[in-house]
Amino acid sequence: MKRFDSLAFVDIETTGSSCNRDQIIEIGVVRVTEMGIQEWHSLLNPHMQIPLMIKQLTGISNSQLEQAPDFADIAKELFSLLTGCVFVAHNARFDLGFLKNAFKRVGLEFAPSVLCTVRLSRTLHPQYSRHNLDSLIERHRLSTESRHRALADARLVHQFWQRVLTEFDEEWLSQVLIKLIQHPSLPSHLDFDLVKQLPQTPGVYLFYGENDLPLYIGKSINLKQRVMSHFSADHRQSKEMR
């Protein structure tokens, strides 16, 4: 699978779920190329207090970040590390949204090919209902030294990828990956085949949330185009699937 010879498995920890309001506090990368495996990690100073919930989740304290670099200090090094690689992350919309915003603030446009391993897991194992990282650890017997630390979680995503490579036929898997990468902006739980069936005609559409409660009703002269437009931008997303 030549197209997938250069991969960057990425995880971030943040002060919250909004890529516009919150800040990155830790980044971990496992870069896999034909030259081998390279790991990269950095804490970041968010210049704001870490919420207690985040401190308890990650174990990262405010005092640890006081002397950490700003994102601007590591941006060029990180950008160079990620350039030319497929960006692989668990619930990739979350990590990508934060990183695109952070790079944009320092004048860099970050627009990689993206592979979400939540969507990959759903595609490869549709018989399971849960595809968060803890479920993958249990299901695939992944080894972990800790959870909710950036480099440790990036290593877990890499481990899952290694399991996938040994479990599935290479030619078939390559087609699956190409399809997923071509539609990276869709939410991890949304079936692309369902979206593909939408007509390009006038009509009304309805989004449902949990417990089948309606969230949004819209209308358009082109249903498919309009529904897809809801997912074309970078969205805030919680770490529910991580």
Segments predicted by a language model, with ranges:
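DnaQ-like (DEDDh/DEDDy) 3′-5′ exonuclease domain used for proofreading
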Residues: 1-25, 152, 156-194
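A positively charged, amphipathic N-terminal helix/segment that binds anionic biomolecules
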Residues: 165-242
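Short hydrophobic beta-strand that contains or immediately precedes a catalytic carboxylate
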Residues: 9-10, 115, 215-217
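Short, glycine/acidic-enriched loop or turn micro-motifs at the edges of active sites
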Residues: 14-16, 94, 119, 156, ...
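Conserved beta-strand -> loop -> alpha-helix junction used to position metal-binding or nucleic-acid-contacting
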Residues: 109-122, 242
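Conserved non-catalytic scaffold segment of RNase H-like nuclease domains
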Residues: 1-112, 126-148
